[in-house]
């Protein structure tokens, strides 16, 4: 029996009433994963033994009626550390790495008696926009198995969209939660930088990375954020601002809310059908009582260039720790220390990771630092100032999540620049450290379109309020791919 059509609140009621046990729910979820995995390839590791052990322990002490997440399964992106469960970052470099600690986000989930059911596929070290750079497999879009799921958190998105699991965690450095959420018609939130601890997240771009939730609905997404968001002394970038309940504004109307629509988000590079879908969404928000006005974010056009200098520079530094000495892959043909370093990194990293390490090393090198890294930092400040000006007069910003719908497998993975431009609309949010959500907003030729809502820092409650209001008057979130029902 499958429970994948039940909301978290409905599952909680069943667990509290003892109509099902945590073990039965876990077993049903494992079956949902196994029956769909060959078709979509969402998971690198399914932690069946660990999950059933956790479920048995929860059943033994009883479901906590006051704890919504007690006994609820959770899928976790494979760059988030999980004790006793392999954490590979989808790389040959970490193919056998089993952490001795949990990431704070995972520890928070365990503290609420959630059950980690497995680790999801991703682009290697979160570098990619299609989940095709994974060392292990290519994940497929839940709606069309010939299309990419987006990236880098592709497995976390398809696991939810295909009905394998109700909730999952991803990470977002330049759009890695929101883009796959859009491509698979689920809800994905990138929180304000510092809202969720980065402790235990395998670092890519330290000034950009943020862990966030995937769910089928806005409310369930907020409920999962309630679990994982916390201040953390182990993370120096943990934000001091704390929200008591991210669901608190869900259900309120949005009459009088002022929403900005940047003209740059509907300009060059945006598919006409995506633009039409967004403009239809604007009418929905206006019908709900919000005011939507056109604005300008003039420096957003530089976002992709700025991002790939800063993110690659940070990655080139962060990935120096992977050298074959302490853990992970080590080349067996090395005859001395230099060869251990060179051969291990040459063989252990994939092409995209090596490309970004080289780009970042170049940007930080003597003679080029001022021209590239320093200049990128200055333009990043201009992008932040653009957002600040808009948010002085508006509550939220609205636009498409992606410039196109999901593209075909093996179509852009040999064209890095085209792949990078797929993050055109999500990258500025990371550069500014802002919260952004992607929600289902329609379909083009049978493929999902995502609508992005962006807020000022710590405005997740307002984002959820507006997203839930839109969700309540549309049915896109209720439409499911064929695989959700069990058919391939």
Curated annotation (Swiss-Prot):
Listed GO cellular component terms?
glutamyl-tRNA(Gln) amidotransferase complex
Q: Which UniProt keywords apply?
A: ATP-binding, Ligase, Nucleotide-binding, Protein biosynthesis
Q: What reaction does this enzyme carry out catalytically?
A: L-glutamyl-tRNA(Gln) + L-glutamine + ATP + H2O = L-glutaminyl-tRNA(Gln) + L-glutamate + ADP + phosphate + H(+)
Residue numbers annotated as active site: 77 (charge relay system), 152 (charge relay system), 176 (acyl-ester intermediate)
Entry superkingdom: Bacteria
Q: Which family is this protein grouped under? A: Belongs to the amidase family. GatA subfamily.
The protein's name in its UniProt record: Glutamyl-tRNA(Gln) amidotransferase subunit A
């Amino acid at each position: 029996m499958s429970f994948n059509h039940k909301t978290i609140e409905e599952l909680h009621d069943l667990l509290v009433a003892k109509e099902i046990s945590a073990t039965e729910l876990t077993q049903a979820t494992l079956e949902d994963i196994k029956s769909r995995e060959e078709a979509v390839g969402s998971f690198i590791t399914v932690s069946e033994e660990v999950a059933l052990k956790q479920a048995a322990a929860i059943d033994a002490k009883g479901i906590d009626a006051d704890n919504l997440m007690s006994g609820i399964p959770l899928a976790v992106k494979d760059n988030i550390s999980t004790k006793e469960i392999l954490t590979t970052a989808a790389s040959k470099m970490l193919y056998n790495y089993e952490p001795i600690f949990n990431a704070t986000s995972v520890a928070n989930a365990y503290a609420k008696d959630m059950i980690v059911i497995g680790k999801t596929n991703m682009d290697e070290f979160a570098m990619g926009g299609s989940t095709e750079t994974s060392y292990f497999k290519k994940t497929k879009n839940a709606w069309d198995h010939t299309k990419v799921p987006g990236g880098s958190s592709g497995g976390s998105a398809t696991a939810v969209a295909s009905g394998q699991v109700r909730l999952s965690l991803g990470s977002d450095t330049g759009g890695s939660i929101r883009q796959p959420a859009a491509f698979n018609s689920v809800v994905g939130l990138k929180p304000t930088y510092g809202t969720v601890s980065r402790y235990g997240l395998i670092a890519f771009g330290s000034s950009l990375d943020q862990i966030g939730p995937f769910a089928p609905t806005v409310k369930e997404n907020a409920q999962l954020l309630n679990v994982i968001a916390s201040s953390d002394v182990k993370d120096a970038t943990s934000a001091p601002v704390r929200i008591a309940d991210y669901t608190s504004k869900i259900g309120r109307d949005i009459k009088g809310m002022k929403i900005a629509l940047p003209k740059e988000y509907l300009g060059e590079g945006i598919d006409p059908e995506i633009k039409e879908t967004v403009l239809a969404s604007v009418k929905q928000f206006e019908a709900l009582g919000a005011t939507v006005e056109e604005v300008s974010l003039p420096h957003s056009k530089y976002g992709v260039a700025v991002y790939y200098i800063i993110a690659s520079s940070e990655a080139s530094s962060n990935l120096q720790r992977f050298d074959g000495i302490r853990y992970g892959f080590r080349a067996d043909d090395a005859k001395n220390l230099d060869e251990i370093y060179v051969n291990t990194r040459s063989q252990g990293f994939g092409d995209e990771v090596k490309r970004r390490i080289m780009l970042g090393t170049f940007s930080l090198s003597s003679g080029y630092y001022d021209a590239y890294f320093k200049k990128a930092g200055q333009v990043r400040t201009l992008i932040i100032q653009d957002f600040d000006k808009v948010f002085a007069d508006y509550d939220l910003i609205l636009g498409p999540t992606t410039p196109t719908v999901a593209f075909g497998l093996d179509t852009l993975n040999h064209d890095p620049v085209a792949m990078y431009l797929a993050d055109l609309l999500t990258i500025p949010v990371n550069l500014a450290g802002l919260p952004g959500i992607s929600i289902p907003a329609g379909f083009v030729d049978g493929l999902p379109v995502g609508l992005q809502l962006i807020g000022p820092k710590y405005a997740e409650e307002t984002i959820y309020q507006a997203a839930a209001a839109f969700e309540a008057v549309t049915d896109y979130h209720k439409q499911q791919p064929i695989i959700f029902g069990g058919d391939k």
